[in-house]
Each structure stands twice: as C-alpha cells, then as structure tokens.
Curated annotation (Swiss-Prot):
Keywords: Autophagy, Cell membrane, Coiled coil, Cytoplasm, Cytoplasmic vesicle, Cytoskeleton, Developmental protein, Differentiation, Endocytosis, Lipid-binding, Membrane, Neurogenesis, Phosphoprotein, SH3 domain. The modification Phosphoserine is found at S295, S488, S501, S505. One of its GO terms (biological process) is plasma membrane tubulation. It is found in: Cytoplasm; Cytoplasm, Cytoskeleton; Cytoplasm, Cell cortex; Cytoplasmic vesicle. Residues 541-605 are annotated as: Interaction with DAAM1, DIAPH1 and DIAPH2. Residues 245-535 are annotated as: Interaction with CDC42. This is Formin-binding protein 1-like. Pfam families: FCH, SH3_1. It is a peripheral membrane protein. The gene is Fnbp1l.
Length: 605
C-alpha cells in the first residue's frame, strides 16, 4: 500500500489530510497544555492549603506537642510533598509531551510545505511540457492547413489556362515553402509529444510516487509521535506513583502515631497547677458559746463585756477579721500561725496543751461568716491567666507547677549559655597564652576586650542562674509546705484555709505564708561543677600521632609518630587538642599533627 500508486491523482486530498494531521497534533498539544495548567493549579492550591493550615511558629512554646497535632502537621508535610509530585507531573508533561509536540508540529509544517512545493513544481513542469507540446501541435496543425491552402491555390492556377507561368511558379514556390514548414512543425510536434509523454510517465510513475511516499512517511511519523506522546503522558503520571504512595503511607503512619494517652498526659503537664484539692467542710459548732463559762481557766483570751456573745457581734468580729479576703488587719493583731493555736498554760505546773480561745474563736467565726469555699478552679484560672497582664520575670503569674517548669527551662538555657561562654573564655585564654609565648602569631592585648566581655557575660549568667535557682527553691519550698499542710489537724486545716481566698485562689504574701526552708538536694550549682578539676576529664575519643611533636612549651604534651593518645577535649578553634597518655600525663598537642577519632556519643558534647 503506497500513496504514490494508490493516490496518484489525489494531490489535493493529500494536501488536506496532512493539514488535518498537523491540526490534530496541535489540538492534542493544546489539550496537554491545559492538563499541565490543571496540575499546576492543583499543586498551587494544595501548597496554599498546607500554608494556610500550617501556622507560623514564632517561638518554641507555639510548637505542636500533642500527638494529634504533630500527626496533622506530618500529614500537611506529606501533602506538601504530594503537591510537589503534582508539580513534577506538570513539569514532565511540559518537557516530555507538550514541548516535544510543539517542536515536532513545527518540523512537520516545514516538511509538509517542502513536499507540497515539490509536488506543485513537478505538476507545473508537466503542465509546461504539455503546453509546449500543445503549442507545437497547434502550430503543426496551422502549417498543415496553410500547406493545404497553398496546394489548392497551386492546383487552381496550374489548371487555369489564363494564369501566367510566373503566377504558377510563384504558387508552386509557396506550396513548397508551406510544405517544408509543415514538415518542420510536424517534426517539432513529434519531438514535443515524445518529450511530454516521457515527462508525464516520469511524473506519474517516479516523481509523484516519491513525493507522496515522503508525505506518507511524514504522516506515519506524526502518528507514531502521537502514540509516543500518549505513552509519555501516562508515564509522567506513573513515575510519581511510588513517591505518592510513600506520601500516603506517611499519612497513614502519622495517623497511627496518634496516642490519646500521651495527649492526656500532656494536658496534665501543661495545666497542672500544683495546688491541692479543697478539703472537707468542717463541722460548724454553733453551740460552743452555750457551754463557755467564765470560770474556765483555759480560755484566757479577752472576755467580752456583758458576759455573753450574740451571733451578731460574733459575725461582726468575723467580718472584721476577714482581712485576707478584703480588709487588712489592724497593726496590733499578730498574724495567725499554726503554733498559736495551742498554748501551754498549766495552772498546776503539769505540762499539757490547751486551745487558746482567740484562734479557735477566730476560726469558728471565719467558718460561720466567711464565704463557703466551693471547690472551683475558676478563680485559679482567673488568677493565673496570662491575659491578666504581661508575663513576670519570675513567672509568679503562673501556678506553682507551671512556674517550676518554666524556671527549670530557663535555668537549663542559662547553663547552656554559661557553658558556651566558659568554653569561649578557655579558648581565649589558650590563644592569649600562645600569643604571649609566640608574639609573632598575634598581640595578646587584642584579646583583652573580648575576654572582658566574656567575663561580664559569665558573671551576668551566674547571677541570672542564682536568681532563678532562688525562685525555683522558693517554688519547691512552697509546694513542700503546702503538701505537708494537707495532713495537719482539722484546726490547722481551718487556719490554712483562712489564708486562702474564698474561691481557692493562691496568695503569696510573705507575712501570711508559713514557708519551710528551701529544698536542698545536696548538689552544687552547675557552674560550680564546671570549674571542679578534682576528677580527671573522661576520654571522648582517641588519636594517633601523624607527626612527632617535641612539646617544649609549657602545657604541651610531647608525642612520637604513631603514638596513640586519649582525647579529653576537642579543638575549640585555636588549633590545639587536649590529650592524655595512659600514664595520666596531659597536655595540648597540635590538631594538625594527629588523626582524631571521637566516640559517637561524645561528639558535640
């Protein structure tokens, strides 16, 4: 099957068909372009969605801690990667399919134009040959008619007796001329006819089949290219399926990582105040004044005039003594302490404890007149909320447990900063010693400002650590005292409750809080431990000497080539490493002279 033999007379049809093929190719390229735009918009919308639901975190406190939140953010990360794969699909289609189609369409147009021009030229040449043959034919036909006319004229004059001999001779010459011209045109016509037939045969059996064959091959290549683009279109999607599957697996793993028990524990860690729950309501004895007698020697408090105390006067005194919740006590009233509840007043010399009337009377009036202490954390939340004001430096606006955590975090950060400054100070001192011993390496005085700044930073950090440790000890001391107070007697419980607000809010008055000594755990502060050199430093790795080192300078350690030493301190940037022999001798060696191997758990420490 060949277009050149089967479609030898369908030049115009082939022209239209090849144009349709290129148009179809461009139409498919337009389809791919729109699909690319869809993929790009889809990826862009996914990224915007991830950006919208992944909040910007300005501090560590805003980082997600709950496993459900972490899982959601992991899902967002996987979705972001998924959006990246959609972009990969779009890029692959744009490069491998759309770009290839547009280049191939341009090449097809050029090739088709060239083949059609060759066909038109061949047809024009054949038409020119036919025109020449037709002109020679017409000329031969005309000359033949003229020769026939000349012959008829000659025969007429030759048969005419009246014609002169000159006229006959002239007619004969005219006949011979026309006959000769007719013969020449006949030969010309025969030659043109033979030439046209040859060109026509060549046109329809050689030139046109060759051109049509090229058009056929061009169209078949176009079809093959479309098939390849169809396959590439699908391959662009199939290539990212494994990565997309990993993204989906990551989402599933994120879903499996959700731990409800851990989230519940985080809620406890985040909102635990450290307060004890409110205690039981004490028994309110309204009949105690009935049995009170003036002759009772154990009740040695101030006696009331009239000898009898009514409920109104009792309520009035109770309201006057509720200074923890409203009014402030008079200066002459001593603060109430648990030890003042009991007095030792043996009338006959025997040792026994009796209740003093004023504390008991005070507590009973508190019970009868004070606002009932309903177990509610509304006041706690209101008292400790950060929205009530700016955060204080000692975190006293927080509940004890949260305050302790914040202070501990700050102490840890300050200790890390102190360690960094101490390392820098040590490195500067080493560099200063090197400069003093080798002045050509640098000026020791140039390091003095940096050393002074480092010392100031160390002093400042130590003061901050000491201050925060004092606050931490205060919090721990309060927590211990309040915990012990829960196990006291009912009377002691009443006094303790008298130091709390009606709604259970916490008061931090130094004159009202019975504080125990700070909890000492028998450990020194961290910056004290940093300067203790009683114990040898642990080895963090080992090294092998590449070159020998004499170690004449003070503080250095001589070594031989190939000798193995212990590393007890890394190079701080000054070019020296602290090493130790097996016999315990320590010193500094040049870092470039040794091959260092550090333990994995000691790197970066």
């Amino acid at each position: 099957m060949s277009w050149g033999t089967e479609l030898w007379d369908q030049f115009d049809s082939l022209d239209k068909h090849t144009q349709w093929g290129i148009d179809f190719l461009e139409r498919y390229a337009k389809f791919v372009k729109e699909r690319i735009e869809i993929e790009q918009n889809y990826a862009k919308q996914l990224r915007n969605l991830v950006k919208k639901y992944c909040p910007k975190r300005s501090s560590k406190d805003e980082e997600p801690r709950f496993t459900s939140c972490i899982a959601f953010f992991n899902i967002l990360n996987e979705l972001n990667d998924y959006a990246g794969q959609r972009e990969v699909v779009a890029e692959e289609m744009a490069h491998r399919v759309y770009g290839e189609l547009m280049r191939y369409a341009h090449d097809l147009k050029t090739e088709r134009k060239m083949h059609l021009q060759e066909g038109r030229k061949a047809q024009q040449y054949l038409d020119m040959c036919w025109k020449q043959m037709d002109n020679s034919k017409k000329k031969f036909e005309r000359e033949c008619r003229e020769a026939e006319k000349a012959q008829q004229s000659y025969e007429r004059l030759d048969n005419d007796t009246n014609a002169t001999k000159a006229d006959v001779e002239k007619a004969k010459q005219q006949l011979n001329l026309r006959t000769h011209m007719a013969d020449e045109n006949k030969n010309e016509y025969a030659a043109q006819l033979q030439n046209f037939n040859g060109e026509q045969h060549k046109h329809f059996y050689v030139v046109i089949p060759q051109i049509y064959k090229q058009l056929q091959e061009m169209d078949e290549r176009r079809t093959i290219k479309l098939s390849e683009c169809y396959r590439g279109f699908a391959d662009s999607e199939r290539k990212v399926i494994p990565i997309i599957s990993k993204c989906l697996e990551g989402m599933i793993l994120a879903a499996k990582s959700v731990d409800e028990r851990r989230d519940s524990q985080m809620v406890v860690d985040s909102f635990k105040s450290g307060f004890e729950p409110p205690g039981d309501f004490p028994f309110e004895d309204y009949s105690q004044h009935i049995y009170r007698t003036v002759s009772d020697g154990t009740i040695s408090a101030s006696k009331q005039e009239g000898g009898k105390m009514d409920s109104k006067s009792t309520a009035g005194k109770a309201k006057g003594k509720l200074w923890l919740f409203g009014k402030k006590p008079k200066p002459q009233s001593p603060p109430l302490t648990p030890t003042s509840l009991f007095t030792s007043s043996p009338p006959n010399g025997s040792q026994f404890l009796t209740l003093s009337i004023e504390p008991v009377h005070y507590c009973m009036n508190e019970i009868k007149t004070g606002k009932p202490r309903i177990p509610s954390f509304r006041s706690l939340k209101r008292g400790w909320s950060m929205k009530m004001g700016p955060a204080l430096e000692d975190f006293s606006h927080l509940p004890p447990e949260q305050r302790r955590k914040k202070l501990q975090q700050r102490i840890d950060e300050l200790n890390r900063g102190l360690q960094k400054e101490s390392d820098q100070k040590e490195a500067l001192n080493k560099m200063k010693d090197v400069y003093e011993k080798n002045p050509q390496m640098g000026d020791p005085g140039s390091l003095q400002p940096k050393l002074a700044e480092t010392m100031n930073n160390i002093d400042r950090l130590r003061m901050e650590i000491h201050k925060n440790e004092a606050w931490l000890s205060e919090v721990e001391g309060k927590t211990g005292v309040r915990g012990d107070r829960r196990h006291s007697s009912d009377i002691n419980h009443l006094v303790t409750q008298g130091r709390e607000s009606p709604e259970g809010s916490y008061t931090d008055d130094a004159n009202q809080e019975v504080r125990g000594p700070p909890q000492q755990h028998g450990h020194h502060s961290e910056f004290d431990d940093e300067f203790e050199d009683d114990d040898p430093l642990p080895a963090i790795g080992h090294c092998k000497a590449i070159y020998p080192f004499d170690g004449h300078n003070e503080g250095t350690l001589a070594m031989k080539e190939g000798e193995v030493l212990y590393i007890i301190e890394e190079d701080k940037g000054d070019g020296w490493t602290r090493a130790r022999r097996q016999n315990g001798e320590e010193g500094y060696v040049p870092t470039t002279y040794i091959d260092v191997t550090l333990e994995k758990n000691s790197k970066g420490s």
